[in-house]
Amino acid sequence: MIPVVALVGRPNVGKSTLFNRLTRTRDALVADFPGLTRDRKYGRAFLAGYEFIVVDTGGIDGSEEGIETKMAEQSLAAIEEADVVLFMTDARAGMTAADLAIAQHLRSRDKVTFVVANKVDGIDADSACGEFWSLGLGEVYQMAAAQGRGVTNMIDYALTPYAEAMGIVRELDEEGEQVEREYTEEEAEAEQERLQNLPIKLAIIGKPNVGKSTLINRILGEERVVVYDEPGTTRDSIYIPMSREGREYVLIDTAGVRRRSKVNEVIEKFSVIKTLKAVEDANVVLLVIDAREGIAEQDLGLLGFTLNAGRALVIAINKWDGIDQKVKDRVKSELDRRLGFIDFARIHFISALHGTGVGHLYESIEEAYDSATRRVSTSMLTRVMQMSQDDHQPPLVNGRRVKLKYAHAGGYNPPIVVIHGNQVKKLPDSYKRYMMNYFRRSLKVVGTPIQLRFHEGANPFEGRTEKLTVGQERRRKRAMSHIRDRTK
């Protein structure tokens, strides 16, 4: 299971800066002003050979009022959700009463905790960090999150014991990047056969009360999951095995993600992490959206996490019955406007309560899974790559044309295509998007994103200085003397 790392600490110690560096985004607000992170932020990270979910929290300083009190509650809830806690402090400001209070709470929770002294750049770090040993949480790790110093080593140190205990194996190349293996034809065929024989793990996700449990009950034909007309009645992810027409499934019913103003943390403090872990554990994700409420920011957040995880996707617009045509037209227009960038995913309009359109979901779910796990040979991938070059040549880089040599499968679910060539790291994003769409159209991939990885081929001329022949040197001297004569 993918580990969860929570960043906890008082305001303005650098939690959001570290979050952005780990997730390589700017999802959390970052400015030198306390209290900007109003809520937990969730991101997917890969560093030091480990994949993990990172949770950025609002700060705690012991003087909270109003919204700050809620921020403190969110931070405490994040501690409960986490497998590993990074307790962040400010080495420049020194230890405060809030640090002591947080440390006392962490000791009482018996969580795997690492004390991180941030902002050690430009100061005598050893002297500044000495007082944090008195927090009683073990060794103090020095870091400068804004510059990235110490971040990789910290994650490596924090997650290695967890990975060893859970049997997680990491693979890194010499540059510390995740390894994409090159499958032989026999290995690719064996991997596809293995995946085809496994049950399809289907995570049904969405906000509370959009009809996820009703949809599962409709699929199963019985009241297997308790349903009340109250958001959040499903408090934990439930795994339900089933079969249909000879195909095995495992349905994952998740607790919904609700707006924080409506969260009862006692009831649903695990819901977000359970949902995100279910996405990581699934083969296909069915995102359920309420037609009456339209597309909310929470829907887009779940959609973004699903795409970042590389999971196959089907979208169900629920509660489609009983709304007039004008509302239906407005919803379809909003879907085109806000979800047009995921044109590979099938969208279904259903009524989980009455069963309308539910039967058609299976076809799209199986189609998405088959696309995500389909074997494509190296020769076919290389041929498609060459066709894309013939139709639209790669751009020039420093006066030289980018050369793509060959492509092979680097993984399944999601399908990964690894492309080898010269100067491929310098390809603009626009050309990479063109190639990704070209592969999707050529291979008829539906319901799953395709990931392209580019590997640089060794350049045998790199580092060599060009040495002129005797004749070239003579002609160069004549040309230079001619230029000097003209300038006199």
Curated annotation (Swiss-Prot):
<dbReference type="InterPro" id="IPR016484">
    <property type="entry name" value="GTPase_Der"/>
</dbReference>
<comment type="function">
    <text>GTPase that plays an essential role in the late steps of ribosome biogenesis.</text>
</comment>
<dbReference type="GO" id="GO:0042254">
    <property type="term" value="P:ribosome biogenesis"/>
</dbReference>
<keyword id="KW-0547">Nucleotide-binding</keyword>
<feature type="binding site">
    <location>
        <begin position="318"/>
        <end position="321"/>
    </location>
    <ligand>
        <name>GTP 2</name>
    </ligand>
</feature>
<comment type="subunit">
    <text>Associates with the 50S ribosomal subunit.</text>
</comment>
<dbReference type="InterPro" id="IPR015946">
    <property type="entry name" value="KH_dom-like_a/b"/>
</dbReference>
<keyword id="KW-0690">Ribosome biogenesis</keyword>
<dbReference type="InterPro" id="IPR032859">
    <property type="entry name" value="KH_dom-like"/>
</dbReference>
<dbReference type="GO" id="GO:0005525">
    <property type="term" value="F:GTP binding"/>
</dbReference>
<feature type="domain" description="EngA-type G 2">
    <location>
        <begin position="200"/>
        <end position="373"/>
    </location>
</feature>
<comment type="similarity">
    <text>Belongs to the TRAFAC class TrmE-Era-EngA-EngB-Septin-like GTPase superfamily. EngA (Der) GTPase family.</text>
</comment>
<feature type="binding site">
    <location>
        <begin position="9"/>
        <end position="16"/>
    </location>
    <ligand>
        <name>GTP 1</name>
    </ligand>
</feature>
<dbReference type="GO" id="GO:0043022">
    <property type="term" value="F:ribosome binding"/>
</dbReference>
<dbReference type="InterPro" id="IPR031166">
    <property type="entry name" value="G_ENGA"/>
</dbReference>
<protein>
    <recommendedName>
        <fullName>GTPase Der</fullName>
    </recommendedName>
</protein>
<keyword id="KW-0342">GTP-binding</keyword>
<feature type="binding site">
    <location>
        <begin position="253"/>
        <end position="257"/>
    </location>
    <ligand>
        <name>GTP 2</name>
    </ligand>
</feature>
<feature type="domain" description="EngA-type G 1">
    <location>
        <begin position="3"/>
        <end position="166"/>
    </location>
</feature>
<keyword id="KW-0677">Repeat</keyword>
<dbReference type="InterPro" id="IPR006073">
    <property type="entry name" value="GTP-bd"/>
</dbReference>
<dbReference type="InterPro" id="IPR005225">
    <property type="entry name" value="Small_GTP-bd"/>
</dbReference>
<dbReference type="Pfam" id="PF14714">
    <property type="entry name" value="KH_dom-like"/>
</dbReference>
<feature type="binding site">
    <location>
        <begin position="56"/>
        <end position="60"/>
    </location>
    <ligand>
        <name>GTP 1</name>
    </ligand>
</feature>
<feature type="binding site">
    <location>
        <begin position="118"/>
        <end position="121"/>
    </location>
    <ligand>
        <name>GTP 1</name>
    </ligand>
</feature>
<feature type="binding site">
    <location>
        <begin position="206"/>
        <end position="213"/>
    </location>
    <ligand>
        <name>GTP 2</name>
    </ligand>
</feature>
<feature type="domain" description="KH-like">
    <location>
        <begin position="374"/>
        <end position="458"/>
    </location>
</feature>
<dbReference type="Pfam" id="PF01926">
    <property type="entry name" value="MMR_HSR1"/>
</dbReference>
<dbReference type="InterPro" id="IPR027417">
    <property type="entry name" value="P-loop_NTPase"/>
</dbReference>
